[in-house]
Amino acid sequence: LGSLNDTVKAVKIDGAEATTDNVANGTYKVARPFNIVTKDGLSDVAKDFVDYIMSAEGQDIIEQNGYIKIDQNAAAYAGSKPEGKIVVAGSSSVSPVMEKLKEAYLAVNTNADIEIQTSDSTTGVTSTQEGICDIGMASRDLKDTETGVTATTIAQDGIAVIVNNENPVENLTSDQV
């Protein structure tokens, strides 16, 4: 939903419109998780950035960018503003909202340096496993074979099923999709 615009038409699925409210309440079922992937031994600054993402401020940024925040009652950010560099790598779907989170975090913690490397979910998970990055980004759940790391869902992304604006189709069933 974060990329939906007026150049295309989103169709209803099982009668439910593709809206953030409908994804959040479960009536629109075409959605995926936006996960960050970490492993044990995260640096203080990386832990603090994760805390920011999961805070009320971070969750509000997620919502302002068209995604569904995970924690409606998240606590305010109360970080210690540690110093250091964080490398975040992975999903090109998660990357745009991660750039916004980075920008907001750097405004409150000028001691941090964050590099975002955009690729795909598998590379994000693998890079985290191998210690190439501190935080991986994945627009899917972890596979059973992706071990030694932990996924934390930071947002839900509603996936709009779209057609050309001139197409008369207004509604599809889950089976049709």
Residue ranges, per PLM feature:
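Exported/periplasmic ABC-transporter solute-binding proteins
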Residues: 1-176
